[in-house]
A protein has these predicted regions:
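Acidic, glycine-rich loop-and-beta core segments that form the ion-binding/anion-interacting portion
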Residues: 163-191
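A helix-coil-helix interface module used to build multimeric assemblies
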Residues: 1-149, 153-162, 167
Length: 191
């Protein structure tokens, strides 16, 4: 893709950011819709090159991974904020006495700070699980093509780095065909 084509494609994509689209546009999926709109704005010669060395298979896998990655970052930041608030509150209640319960009955006298720190510990384990999931999700599938890679020489690692991924998924079938990372994410947020 020439610099001129890239500028036209990027300009078209930028102009689409704030547009609203009809759900029933006739496009097979969001990728076809975006490609059609980019071609309308940038022209067929430039816009038609947008998917060079890419397939919908690796793009869909990429989109899902980027969305989950963003969601995990948001959730982890919320967890850290909540943990910080619980620890701060616990510092202010180091001498506050409260009843501790077991089997729906008061069992012992304890400290409110002890209770708060127990909740912080639970949330930290949630954070730790999500962070591990993030590491599994944050691998780029781009360049895997539909299932067997691309014949166009590309630097998958460079693309991955530009998009904020820690690395690439080496096996093209794994990159485009599996969704175990989605199941892992759903399982982690279900806890």
């Amino acid at each position: 893709i020439t610099k001129n084509d890239a500028k036209k494609i990027l300009s078209a994509l930028e102009s689409l950011k704030n547009e609203k689209f009809e759900a029933f546009s006739g496009a097979e999926d969001i990728h076809e819709l975006i490609e059609t709109l980019v071609i309308k704005k940038a022209g067929m010669i430039s816009g038609g090159k947008m998917h060079t060395a890419r397939s919908r298979n690796d793009q869909v896998a990429l989109d899902i991974r980027m969305k989950i990655r963003d969601d995990i970052n948001i959730i982890c930041n919320c967890l850290l904020d909540t943990i910080e608030a619980l620890v701060s509150l616990a510092k202010n209640h180091q001498k506050t006495i409260m009843p501790l319960y077991t089997h729906l009955q008061q069992a012992q006298v304890g400290l409110f700070s002890h209770y708060l720190l127990a909740q912080a510990d639970v949330l930290f384990r949630d954070f730790d699980r999500l962070y591990t999931t993030f590491n599994h999700v944050n691998q780029s599938p781009l360049g895997a093509g539909p299932v067997g890679g691309t014949s166009i020489p590309i630097d998958r690692h460079s693309t991955a780095k530009m998009l904020g991924f820690d690395g690439v998924i080496e096996n093209s079938l794994d990159a485009t065909s599996t969704r175990d990372f989605v199941a892992e994410y759903v399982a982690m947020i279900a806890i």
